[in-house]
Design a protein with these regions (language model features):
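Pyridoxal 5′-phosphate
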Residues: 1-308
């Protein structure tokens, strides 16, 4: 079988990922829920995973990594927890429904929304961004790469505009994480949402939010955290502020192993191989009658997601 649905999930995981999940199921307890060995082992592993994610995306702030079950939960947490009635948000027409539907829901609650269009090749109309900014604009949220066309968005350009206007910059890295190197620092990203089971090569049921310090987000859910249990509300400190209930420790163990595998292999090597396979597929598929491609065709030397 030739598998062609990696934008939905990667089918083959590295052996070390499968082994890490199995070992966690056999040996790890519940993180933060006790002082016995298996619980402590789980806590240490999850902290190592926070460190790995933080370094991988150049956040370098482990406490700013909050784990979720996927990118959709991460994006809902951010969108529903960051904006209030009267705020204005800018996004693009390229977004996945995990961005658009929560934004439409917030629009019904009084949040203003502007959507930047795209040209004939499905590239963002960047020149429209600054003219969309208002006095009440709070943030720009956009995908790093389209799951439909594979086009990459120039997040460095958007990040610079956001910083110049003191706006929060939120990036959905669902498709690009693990396929394209991402630096939150270089691209001036304030919040990055990711899923673990696509380009990061981790298990399904994993994802998270990377948040720069001093950004306040209302929690999407409340419950047990294993710390400060006497409080009536969620602890204010990250990551516990955004994590309620038992984490997917087994999945996070697999994600930690997957990031280790990517670091050893390097994202750059993965990117070059995927782009080579993409061009090979494109050059042959375009010869098939009645096939139509959306977005820019993949060109050698031009970064493109492994998506057509």
């Amino acid at each position: 079988m030739i598998y062609l649905d990696n934008s939905a999930t990667t089918l083959k995981k590295p052996d070390c990922v499968k082994e890490a999940v199995w070992d966690a199921m056999e040996q790890m307890g519940n993180s933060g829920r006790g002082g016995y060995q298996t619980a402590l082992s789980a806590s240490r592993m999850i902290y190592q995973a926070r460190m790995a994610v933080s370094e991988f995306f150049d956040l370098n702030h482990p406490s700013g990594v909050a784990f979720t079950s996927n990118a959709t939960e991460a994006l809902n947490t951010v969108i529903q927890g960051l904006f209030s009635k009267g705020d204005h948000v800018i996004t693009t027409v390229l977004e996945h429904n995990s961005v658009l539907r929560p934004l439409y829901m917030e629009q019904e609650r009084g949040v203003e929304l502007s959507i930047i269009g795209a040209d004939e090749q499905a590239d963002v109309l960047y020149e429209k961004l600054e003219s969309a900014i208002k006095c009440n604009t709070k943030a720009v949220i956009c995908t790093h790469g389209s799951n439909v066309t594979g086009n990459l968005v120039d997040i460095k350009r958007i990040g610079a505009v956001c910083r110049a206007h003191q706006l929060l910059f939120i990036v959905d890295a669902s498709q690009s994480a693990g396929c394209i190197p991402i630096s939150m620092k270089e691209n001036q990203i304030d919040i990055l949402c990711f899923t673990g089971h696509k380009g990061l090569m981790g298990p399904q049921g994993t994802g998270g939010i990377c948040i720069r310090p001093q950004i306040s987000i209302r929690p999407l859910k409340s419950g047990g955290t294993g710390v400060l249990s006497f409080l009536k509300e969620q602890p204010q400190e990250l990551p516990e502020h955004l994590e309620a209930g038992t984490l997917n420790g087994h999945g996070i163990a697999g994600l930690l192993a997957a990031i280790g595998w990517l670091n050893r292999t390097t994202v750059e090597v993965v990117q070059k191989k995927e782009e080579k396979l993409l061009r090979l597929f494109y050059e042959n598929a375009k010869e098939i009658p009645k096939i139509h491609f959306y977005g820019r065709p993949p060109e050698e030397g031009v970064p493109h997601l492994p998506v057509l």
